[in-house]
Amino acid sequence: MTELARLKFYATQPHTCSYLPEEQATTLFLDPSQPMDVQVYADLSDMGFRRSGDHLYRPHCQNCSACVPARIPVNLFVPDRQQKRILKRNADVQVQSARPAFTEEYFDLYQRYIEQRHADGDMFPPSREQFSTFLVRDLPFSRFYEFRVDQRLLAVAVTDLLPNGLSAVYTFYEPDEERRSLGRYAILWQIAEAARLQLQAVYLGYWIKNCKKMNYKTQYRPIELLTNQRWVTLY
């Protein structure tokens, strides 16, 4: 029996989908008593799982398949003209890696981001407890990539370093710096970092065609979508 075959999973009861409110969602979770092994995590990422806090999960909906796992094949990616402009616009940004931690600097930025960009979502209102539970986990593969200009914190990309790629868990950034397109820049930086580390992919989570907040991911080409248990490349 393989390691994955020994794993246990639990499905939630149907609940209102946070992305498509007209739909009922069911979520499949890895047994929380299972240690968060980085190789198991990597293997499950290839099967469409994501991390939130201490949990690995995947949509398991009976009547909907709108959430499509997406990843960028690093060696094939070429930035388009707009993405090159974003890279040039942020040439003054310095990025450094930090261990996950709670600081007032992080939380102040997170709070402004949620209040100004996601006040209509289920993460509003932001709280210190929510921030810590969601993002500040003591996991050896988790990183806070800090994006700074002259020591001013502009963005944090919470990223998991896996054997097969980088998993972009969550990014929050300065909402007043709209011209920089910091969310897009963070993804472009993670692609470059994955290439530097000779990793295969950047896992972006779920692409949802009819959800404006989630359909931007296909702007990065080529992109691979997990369809019928097979990664399909879109150019």
From Swiss-Prot:
Catalytic activity: N-terminal L-glutamyl-[protein] + L-leucyl-tRNA(Leu) = N-terminal L-leucyl-L-glutamyl-[protein] + tRNA(Leu) + H(+); N-terminal L-aspartyl-[protein] + L-leucyl-tRNA(Leu) = N-terminal L-leucyl-L-aspartyl-[protein] + tRNA(Leu) + H(+)
Entry GO terms, CC: cytoplasm
Cellular location(s): Cytoplasm
Keywords, in A-Z order: Acyltransferase, Cytoplasm, Transferase
EC numbers, comma separated: 2.3.2.29
A GO molecular function held by the record: leucyl-tRNA--protein transferase activity
Family recorded in the similarity comment: Belongs to the R-transferase family. Bpt subfamily.
PANTHER family, alphabetized: ARGININE-TRNA-PROTEIN TRANSFERASE 1, ARGINYL-TRNA--PROTEIN TRANSFERASE 1
Name the record gives this protein: Aspartate/glutamate leucyltransferase
Organism of provenance: Pseudomonas savastanoi pv. phaseolicola (strain 1448A / Race 6)
Name of the gene: bpt
